[in-house]
């Protein structure tokens, strides 16, 4: 097969790749921000997630973390709700630090 005959296929393939929607992976429950948040909650160390937010947002993250840790101790349902609250807060602040809007966890 001649190299020139592959060009149309390569061009079409590139067009499909470029047209694919790009999602913000950091918004995902399986993304790096929420993964770090899970680790932080399980270890009790809020410093593990501070790399994901701007310095100006660290106090809000620490407050949300402390609230989540306190509520997690109540029962399994409270734990799930507290975790979700912390994930939402962290991802929202992370996206704001990137200058992007927050549209919820994916």
Regions found by a protein language model. Name each.
Residues 45-79:
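N-terminal, post-signal-peptide region of Sec/Tat-exported proteins
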